[in-house]
Amino acid sequence: MRLNVGLIGKGKWGTILKSKLTEIANLKFVLGKNKNYFDFILANKLSWVFIATPNNTHFELVKNCLNLKVNVFCEKPLTINYLEAKKLIKIAKKNKVKLYVSDVYSFHNKKPKKILLKNRIIRSKKSNMNDNEFFYRFMYHDISILFNFLKKYNIKSVSFKKFIKKKIYKTNIQFKN
């Protein structure tokens, strides 16, 4: 039996998710982030809502779906704020629903591992994006890959700074030890 699912987000990742969801589920609707999705969710008795909208919209969308007692798959990052992420986890537990954050690149680490074993300095080039896009969409993958190799060192925080007319970013990873 195929599950009834809905998709909020019509951008690049929304389009990718749509093509996959139509193959494996009953995709009941695809909405932009500004549509009133409450009625669609309630009318279609959904098992899951997939969210692929801009990062700054994730918290409210996910929170509202969880409060409707619907399982949520959210494209990363879950939120742009740690405390908001903790709130969403608490809401999911309270409502006994599942909350999943896409993290597919964490499982493809053979090549990065070879690079890490050879090099002490790792450079990652990204261009044509604003600060939030850079950090939350692209650096996320770099940090996620690094985390797989550095987790035994207890990471305390990750931050970034922009330099040279906003074209170069420096990322700092601070360890507890």
Question: Where are these predicted regions, by residue range?
Answer:
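A contiguous active-site-proximal alpha/beta segment in oxidoreductase catalytic domains
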Residues: 79-132, 142
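Conserved acidic residues
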Residues: 28, 47, 120
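Histidine-centered divalent metal-coordination motifs
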Residues: 17, 58, 141
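Rossmann-like dinucleotide-binding domain that binds NAD(P)(H)
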Residues: 125-177
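N-terminal Rossmann-like dinucleotide-binding module
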Residues: 1-34
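Beta-strand-loop-alpha-helix segment that lines the small-molecule cofactor/substrate pocket
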Residues: 48, 54-55, 59-103
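Short amphipathic alpha-helix with an adjacent loop that forms part of the alpha/beta core around
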Residues: 37-45, 113-114
